[in-house]
C-alpha cells in the first residue's frame, strides 16, 4: 500500500504541468501513488505529462512510485474530478495537488512523518503564492 496518494486534476495546464509533475516525481518520500485525472483537457497537457513520465520512469521502481492517468468520460469540473481521483486511491493518506502548482521535494516526507509521529488522521501545511503572470 502506498504511504501517500496524490490526486492531480488536469485541465488547461499545458504551461504548468511539466513543473508540477517534475516536483512530484522528485519527492524524497518513497511509496507514493500519483493519480492524474484528465478532465478532457483541450490542450497538450497530457502529451506534456506523458513526456515527463517517460523521463522520470527509471526512478519509479527505485522509489516505488505508482503513476496513472485516468480520463473522465466528459468534462466534469474540479469537484467531480477530485472525487473520482480519490475513489481510485489506495494510499494510507490522500492529498491533492493542483496541476498549476509545484511542491518542495521534501513536502510529502515531512507531512507523512508528522502524521506517523502524532497518529494524525489529517495534517496540514502552509504554502506560498507566487504571481505566475
Feature names for model-found ranges:
Residues 1-133:
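Nucleotide-sugar donor-binding/catalytic module of glycosyltransferases
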Amino acid at each position: 500500500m502506498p504511504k501517500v496518494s496524490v490526486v492531480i486534476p488536469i485541465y488547461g495546464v499545458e504551461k504548468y504541468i511539466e513543473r508540477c509533475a517534475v516536483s512530484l516525481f522528485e519527492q524524497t518520500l518513497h511509496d507514493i501513488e500519483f493519480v492524474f485525472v484528465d478532465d478532457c483537457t483541450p490542450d497538450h497537457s497530457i502529451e506534456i505529462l506523458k513526456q515527463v513520465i517517460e523521463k522520470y520512469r527509471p526512478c519509479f521502481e527505485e522509489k516505488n512510485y505508482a503513476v496513472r492517468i485516468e480520463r473522465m468520460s466528459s468534462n466534469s469540473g474540479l469537484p467531480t474530478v477530485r472525487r473520482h481521483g480519490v475513489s481510485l486511491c489506495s494510499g494510507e493518506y490522500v492529498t491533492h495537488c493542483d496541476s498549476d502548482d509545484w511542491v518542495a521535494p521534501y513536502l510529502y516526507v515531512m507531512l507523512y512523518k508528522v502524521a506517523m509521529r502524532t497518529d494524525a488522521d489529517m495534517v496540514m501545511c502552509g504554502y506560498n503564492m507566487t504571481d505566475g503572470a
